[in-house]
Amino acid sequence: MARECYITGRKARSGNKRSHAMNKSKRRFGANVQKVRILVDGKPKRVYVSARALKSGKVERV
């Protein structure tokens, strides 16, 4: 469960890398997750949180 948002559950997705000739090969699109300290059950904990959750105010840093 590494590199997954603790709040929203956002994580890496798979897709295709396309060359100029439109050949395809598999690749991963990583989620923009940051390691931050937040309060979990009243105690500070270091977890991965997506940038979208941080910007929208769904979580408060400690």
Curated annotation (Swiss-Prot):
<dbReference type="GO" id="GO:0003735">
    <property type="term" value="F:structural constituent of ribosome"/>
</dbReference>
<dbReference type="InterPro" id="IPR026569">
    <property type="entry name" value="Ribosomal_bL28"/>
</dbReference>
<dbReference type="GO" id="GO:0005840">
    <property type="term" value="C:ribosome"/>
</dbReference>
<dbReference type="Pfam" id="PF00830">
    <property type="entry name" value="Ribosomal_L28"/>
</dbReference>
<feature type="region of interest" description="Disordered">
    <location>
        <begin position="1"/>
        <end position="27"/>
    </location>
</feature>
<dbReference type="InterPro" id="IPR001383">
    <property type="entry name" value="Ribosomal_bL28_bact-type"/>
</dbReference>
<comment type="similarity">
    <text>Belongs to the bacterial ribosomal protein bL28 family.</text>
</comment>
<dbReference type="GO" id="GO:0006412">
    <property type="term" value="P:translation"/>
</dbReference>
<keyword id="KW-0689">Ribosomal protein</keyword>
<dbReference type="InterPro" id="IPR037147">
    <property type="entry name" value="Ribosomal_bL28_sf"/>
</dbReference>
<dbReference type="InterPro" id="IPR034704">
    <property type="entry name" value="Ribosomal_bL28/bL31-like_sf"/>
</dbReference>
<protein>
    <recommendedName>
        <fullName>Large ribosomal subunit protein bL28</fullName>
    </recommendedName>
</protein>
<keyword id="KW-0687">Ribonucleoprotein</keyword>
<dbReference type="InterPro" id="IPR050096">
    <property type="entry name" value="Bacterial_rp_bL28"/>
</dbReference>
<feature type="compositionally biased region" description="Basic residues">
    <location>
        <begin position="10"/>
        <end position="27"/>
    </location>
</feature>
<dbReference type="GO" id="GO:1990904">
    <property type="term" value="C:ribonucleoprotein complex"/>
</dbReference>
